[in-house]
A protein has these predicted regions:
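Serine-hydrolase catalytic machinery in alpha/beta-hydrolase-like enzymes
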Residues: 11-100, 111-112, 194
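Short glycine-rich catalytic loops that host catalytic nucleophiles or stabilize transition states
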Residues: 64, 183-189
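Short beta-strand immediately N-terminal to the catalytic nucleophile in serine-hydrolase-like folds
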Residues: 103-105, 129
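Gly/Ala-rich beta-loop-alpha elbow adjacent to hydrolase catalytic centers
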Residues: 105-109, 113
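A conserved short beta-strand
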Residues: 122-133
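Short beta-strand/loop motif that positions the catalytic acidic residue
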Residues: 150-151, 156-158, 162
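Acidic catalytic loop of the alpha/beta-hydrolase fold
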Residues: 160-165, 191
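Catalytic histidine-centered segment of alpha/beta-hydrolase-like enzymes
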Residues: 188-197
Length: 210
């Protein structure tokens, strides 16, 4: 029911929101995935998603600080333009418009992708894995100012015990996204197991696990 505004839930993977799947998954030419602040492109969840989405092209990217050998967190003011540059360059390599790519990532990486889209980066959709709504224990320090400018289909997948945002908090605040939105809660915390996360992403793409 892409683009609709229904709510559903139940089982180990509980979906809710305003859109069941990507509006047109057949038009997606690739998926660009970014890591969390202290991780890299080889994070196991990103690797699992690349394998599951095959043969769809997937680019798992480092941020620029990792490319320079710095393992610390990247600054948003550096991460966002770098992400946009990589997305445009990869789209050119694939011979497609940047708007045919799904952008996203885990935690900090997903937030950077959402901010890039809010700043005008074209995208077919946005994938937010364990979105860091606020720092643990600081529910008033919200990272939501840009969300009203995210106008693309969005999937958010988070663990039910994630200290960076409870399911209720995410449902309330991500509702600011005007584009089609699907929220999925899976067992776990900020680093849920890969299988339910992969299953939620494949379902959003209108595909079944292998």
């Amino acid at each position: 029911m892409a683009g609709g505004r229904g709510v559903a839930g139940g089982g180990d993977v509980a979906p809710a929101g305003r859109g069941g799947r990507l509006v047109d998954p057949q038009d997606v030419a690739g998926v660009l995935l970014t890591p969390g602040a202290s991780a890299d492109r080889d994070h196991h969840t990103l690797v699992a998603l690349e394998a599951a989405l095959a043969p769809l092209p997937v680019l798992r990217m480092h941020f620029a600080n990792r490319e320079r050998g710095n393992p610390g967190p990247e600054r948003a003011e550096a991460a966002i333009p770098y992400l946009r540059e990589r997305a445009d360059a990869w789209a050119a390599e694939l011979g497609v418009e940047p708007g045919r790519l799904v952008l996203g990532g885990r935690s900090f990486g997903g937030r950077m992708a959402s901010m890039a889209v809010a700043q005008g980066q074209p995208a077919a959709g946005l994938l937010l894995l364990s979105y860091p709504l606020h720092p643990p224990g600081k529910p008033d320090s919200l990272r939501i100012e840009h969300l009203p400018d995210v106008d693309v289909p969005t999937l958010a997948v988070s663990g039910q015990r994630d200290p960076f945002g409870t399911p209720d908090e995410l449902a309330h605040h991500l509702a600011a996204i005007p584009g089609p939105l699907r929220l999925v809660t899976v067992p776990g915390d900020h680093s849920p197991a890969d299988p339910p996360v992969v299953a939620a992403v494949l379902d959003w793409f209108g595909r079944s696990p292998a």
